Regions:
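Enzymes and membrane/adaptor proteins characterized by extended Gly/Ser/Thr/Asp/Glu-rich
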Residues: 66-103
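Immediate post-signal peptide segment of exported/extracytoplasmic ligand-binding proteins
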Residues: 55-71, 218, 248-257
């Protein structure tokens, strides 16, 4: 079976009966077991295969859910009923969730398959994924480099192709930074957009659960499913959830800003600055409007 980087491509082949969902899950479990980057703490073999068989039954009668067959892994601070969750700390060793996070319930409801839990910095406090009771995570792009953190396992797993989408949590960069380190896409939703129910908290007034994937389309689709008001989280927004997967991606209408003080900072590595400027030119050539903005309080 080939490695998929797009859920749309995977779903097309699944719907064409080129393989079963159970075969797909077994393919990913085997690939996870062969990995040496330590991104996975545990695979949920029994429940994942059970979910896959249910999806296969539904597909046999042409019942399609929005995320049927999407292979998802979750950071080890997100609860999934009956499964282990430790926030990568020995303090919680052996603990099993007594309920599922709202994001997990919504994913499963729409046909996603939760294949396992992912390594992170202990209690999500870190930026290199070296502070875990399960040991450090290696960056699949370069095993001698860190994957970033605290959602390092979430970013590394997607980068290596061990799952199509992962969930991480972000307080001050813990989705965005490891996604950048591992060459994938990570999104921290606006606070209150996604329910925090079932997330082991780090800083409750900043924490947000968000997706990591290989492309914007998969990010949009998952965000569409996990967003929305939740009676179990009083801080969740009651605003209507946009149809993110149908948003207009017309480049000429998109404006991108970057902070000039960051790119001109004396502490910035010259190679990073050069590549950043090349990316700005690339975006401009693609039709985006890219402009600098000032943030003079950066040093404080």
């Amino acid at each position: 079976m080939k490695l998929f980087r797009s859920f749309k491509n995977l779903q097309n082949e699944l719907y064409s009966s080129n393989f079963t969902c159970e075969e797909l899950v077994n393919f990913y479990i085997k690939k996870i077991n062969q990995s040496t980057n330590n991104s996975f703490i545990e695979t949920f073999n029994d429940s994942a295969i059970s979910q896959a068989r249910l999806i296969d039954q539904e597909l046999s009668v042409k019942k399609h859910r929005k995320l049927s067959g999407l292979i998802v892994a979750i950071k080890d601070n997100i609860c999934y009923e009956g499964h282990g969750v430790t926030a990568s700390s020995s303090i919680l060793d052996g603990f099993k969730s007594v309920y599922s996070a709202t994001v997990v319930s919504r994913l499963v409801e729409h046909g996603a398959i939760i294949i396992g839990r992912l390594n992170c910095d202990e209690f999500a406090m870190g930026s290199s994924n070296e502070k875990s009771t399960y040991g450090p995570v290696k960056n699949p792009v370069d095993p001698n480099k860190v994957p970033g953190g605290s959602s390092g396992g979430s970013a590394a797993a997607v980068s290596e192709g061990l799952c199509l989408v992962s969930l991480g949590s972000d307080t001050g960069g813990s989705i965005r930074q490891p996604a950048a380190f591992c060459g994938v896409i990570g999104l921290k939703p606006t606070y209150s957009r996604v329910s925090r129910y079932g997330l082991i908290a780090y800083a409750s007034s900043f924490d947000q659960i968000g997706p990591i994937a290989n492309n914007i389309e998969d990010i949009a689709l998952v965000l569409e499913v996990i967003s929305g008001k939740d009676r179990n989280d009083s801080t969740s927004s009651s605003l209507e959830v946009p149809n993110y997967s149908k948003l207009n991606f017309n480049k000429s209408s998109k404006k991108i800003a970057y902070i000039s003080e960051c790119i001109n900072h004396k502490g910035l590595d010259p190679e990073i600055k050069q590549n950043f400027l090349l990316k700005i030119n690339e975006l401009k050539n693609q039709g985006f409007l890219v402009e600098p903005i000032s943030f003079p309080l950066l040093d404080y």
